[in-house]
Amino acid sequence: MFESISGILTLHERERLCVEVHGIEWEIAVSAYSSAAFGEVGSHVKVFTWLYHREDALRLFGFSNVQERTLFLSLTKVEGIGPKQALKVLSSISSQALCAALDTGDLCALQRIPGIGKKTAQRMLLALKGTLALTDAASCAQSQTDDRAAHPSNLGCAPHAREIEDLVTALVQMGYDRKMAAEVIAQESAALCSVGRSLYEEEATVLKRAILALSIAHPHAVAPAAE
């Protein structure tokens, strides 16, 4: 019903935004990761949205990009995960780390998400493993295009500090040591640069290669999940 809302940001909290559009203020529930992507109060923002409605309530959920919304909707299809729980998941783990955990069948990484027990993690893998790769690539395309248009100097082999930090953070959230993760990501990024390929286009591949490299070189690097 609502694809997105564009307007002036009037409230900016960790998991809640208010956006004014032509004199009407919309309250939007967001993940902590999406919230961090928006600017200061008074700035113009575009929020991708999904409307949750039932007999006694209407609620808008918002996302900084289409990728996160796609993940959110996929999570709500898992038995036992409703919209509120799906948003909590996305506040606890980055989209990159979640996609990687689902794609590689990393049950331990999923169990480290607050509120996700072993049975729910197993249901997530059963429902979503192997289903997000193409969706992830397609939904990332628009946000990557927009980012390249806004920052044309970041093309080619220019430094990708934000993308590198996102990848390192994703690995840390999966239980890997930050220093080891940073070293592997730096190596993979340099390898891409040496053949003239862009990290913008290869982020998901780099994350998978880093997980494989860390698993081989440091098989005990991931801390076991709490019982």
From Swiss-Prot:
Location of the region described as Flexible linker in the Swiss-Prot/TrEMBL record: 144-158
Record region (Domain III): 159-227
Biological process according to GO: DNA recombination; DNA repair
Localization annotation: Cytoplasm
Domain notes: Has three domains with a flexible linker between the domains II and III and assumes an 'L' shape. Domain III is highly mobile and contacts RuvB.
Source organism of the structure: Treponema pallidum (strain Nichols)
GO molecular function, a single term: ATP binding
SUBUNIT field: Homotetramer. Forms an RuvA(8)-RuvB(12)-Holliday junction (HJ) complex. HJ DNA is sandwiched between 2 RuvA tetramers; dsDNA enters through RuvA and exits via RuvB. An RuvB hexamer assembles on each DNA strand where it exits the tetramer. Each RuvB hexamer is contacted by two RuvA subunits (via domain III) on 2 adjacent RuvB subunits; this complex drives branch migration. In the full resolvosome a probable DNA-RuvA(4)-RuvB(12)-RuvC(2) complex forms which resolves the HJ.
Domain II: region residues: 65-143
Lineage per the UniProt record: Bacteria, Pseudomonadati, Spirochaetota, Spirochaetia, Spirochaetales
GO CC annotation: cytoplasm; Holliday junction resolvase complex
Family according to the record: Belongs to the RuvA family.
UniProt keyword terms in alphabetical order: Cytoplasm, DNA damage, DNA recombination, DNA repair, DNA-binding
SMART domains linked: HhH1
Function: The RuvA-RuvB-RuvC complex processes Holliday junction (HJ) DNA during genetic recombination and DNA repair, while the RuvA-RuvB complex plays an important role in the rescue of blocked DNA replication forks via replication fork reversal (RFR). RuvA specifically binds to HJ cruciform DNA, conferring on it an open structure. The RuvB hexamer acts as an ATP-dependent pump, pulling dsDNA into and through the RuvAB complex. HJ branch migration allows RuvC to scan DNA until it finds its consensus sequence, where it cleaves and resolves the cruciform DNA.
Keyword NAD attributed: no
Pfam annotation, one family: HHH_5
Domain I: region residues: 1-64
Protein name: Holliday junction branch migration complex subunit RuvA
